[in-house]
């Protein structure tokens, strides 16, 4: 209840700020949508992720989550946001506060408030939680399924950003909140690993450059990060260590008549938490002198087509995948390859109302035990959007 009170207070403050603007040029936009998903999964998947396609959440062994699939109903995609635009001398202060109902982390599987954006910028500087420059949100296709292509870089992060070039062509450089995860593999549960804790002495550094074209754009991005861990166990053997993570991305949108082609290729080491659906950043590598942590190489790819049949009828279809180069200390059932594909038919009879049906397929392959599993995901969705602007002379 307290969270709802805070949310309501923020909205009301935004409205009040607009109403009190001296020159009438300040503006507040309230927007969002209500979305309902109804569908079925052919196979039993991780119940915390019952309404999305995530190859990493398919079972790693037979009957891990049960024998058969199930029907699902969900409103977790429902979204609400507030944007403000305030004159500040020769510049403009822009803020975005946006949330949805899709629980993750400790709230995985729940219908609860999840912060998407809490971000502000003025001129060439920005701060807050927003899209990482390493990702390209315009690669995301018009899917009904919430999670999206597993092979794209996708991460909202707390950051400080500098944008020396803005517009259709742009350059962004950011310092981002660091973080990572580890897979202890065959060494999981061993006493000598129990006292190891992560440490991040430096922020992640990311950058993007987009070149605007007449029929779309081409974008390149990169990221560098330091991942450290410390052994706090009072033993003669010190398992502390560190690795450097890095990643490169190339992406594009090409507009061809009534079509938009969305493409991305990502490769790096130790950047799995910047990917849309990938496992741990660090794995165990066994050597003649023992075992050490290594940054796991990852490659992701996305190829989707959005096609408009008419002004009211459209389709999105495509394929994506993630490949992990597993270390020799990871367990045989560790995640190795994930594939993702779907096609849909969307209909918008009037503005702000949309319905559609979608058929999706995903597949998981393990590291070395020969296990693989496929799942078919079918859903119908109904979406009602709203947007209202206050102020700005209106």
Predicted segments with their positions:
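Transmembrane beta-strand segments that form the barrel wall of outer-membrane beta-barrel proteins
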Residues: 92-103, 177, 220-226, 314-327, ...
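Outer-membrane beta-barrel "beta-signal"
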Residues: 347-349, 373-394
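Detector for outer-membrane/organellar transmembrane beta-barrel domains
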Residues: 213-335, 392
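Outer-membrane beta-barrel translocator domains and adjoining extracellular loop/strand segments
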Residues: 44-49, 106-112, 138-145, 183-197, ...
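Positively charged n-region of N-terminal signal peptides that target proteins for export
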Residues: 1-4
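Bacterial N-terminal signal peptides
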Residues: 7-15
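Transmembrane beta-barrel outer-membrane domains
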Residues: 71-75, 108-117, 151-155, 198-202, ...
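Outer membrane beta-barrel
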Residues: 22-50, 54-183, 199-217, 252-267, ...
């Amino acid at each position: 209840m307290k969270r709802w009170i805070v949310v309501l207070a923020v909205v009301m403050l935004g409205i009040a700020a607009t109403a009190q603007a001296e020159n009438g040029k300040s503006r507040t936009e309230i927007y969002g949508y209500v979305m309902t998903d109804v569908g079925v999964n052919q196979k039993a998947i991780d119940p915390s992720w019952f309404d999305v396609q995530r190859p990493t959440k398919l079972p790693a062994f037979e009957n891990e989550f049960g024998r058969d699939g199930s029907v699902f109903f969900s409103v977790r995609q429902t979204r609400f946001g507030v944007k403000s635009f305030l004159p500040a001398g020769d510049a403009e202060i822009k803020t975005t506060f946006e949330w949805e109902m899709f629980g993750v982390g400790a709230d995985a599987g729940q219908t609860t408030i999840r912060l998407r954006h809490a971000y502000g910028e003025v001129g060439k500087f920005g701060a807050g939680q927003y899209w990482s420059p390493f990702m390209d949100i315009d690669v995301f296709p018009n899917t009904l399924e919430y999670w999206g292509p597993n092979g794209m870089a996708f991460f909202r992060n707390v950051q400080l950003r500098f944008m020396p070039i803005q517009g259709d062509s742009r350059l962004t450089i950011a310092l981002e909140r660091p973080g990572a995860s580890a897979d202890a593999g065959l060494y999981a549960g061993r006493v000598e690993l129990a006292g190891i804790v992560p440490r991040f002495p430096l922020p992640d550094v990311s950058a993007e450059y987009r070149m605007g074209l007449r029929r779309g754009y081409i974008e390149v991005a990169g990221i560098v990060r330091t991942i450290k861990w410390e052994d706090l166990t009072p033993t003669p053997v010190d398992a502390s260590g560190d690795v450097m993570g890095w990643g490169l991305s190339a992406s594009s949108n090409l507009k061809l008549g009534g079509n938009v082609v969305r493409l991305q290729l990502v490769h790096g080491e130790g950047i799995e938490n910047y990917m849309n659906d990938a496992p741990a950043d660090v794995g165990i590598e066994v050597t003649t002198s023992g075992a050490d942590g290594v940054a796991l190489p990852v490659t992701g790819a996305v190829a989707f087509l959005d096609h408009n049949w008419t002004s009211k009828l459209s389709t999105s279809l495509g394929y994506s995948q993630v490949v992990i180069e597993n270390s020799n200390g990871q367990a045989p059932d560790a995640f190795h390859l994930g594939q993702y594909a779907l096609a849909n038919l969307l209909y918008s009879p009037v503005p702000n109302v949309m319905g559609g049906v979608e058929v999706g397929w995903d597949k998981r392959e393990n590291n070395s035990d020969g296990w693989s599993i496929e799942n078919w995901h079918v859903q119908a969705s109904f979406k009602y959007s709203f947007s209202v602007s206050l102020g700005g002379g209106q």
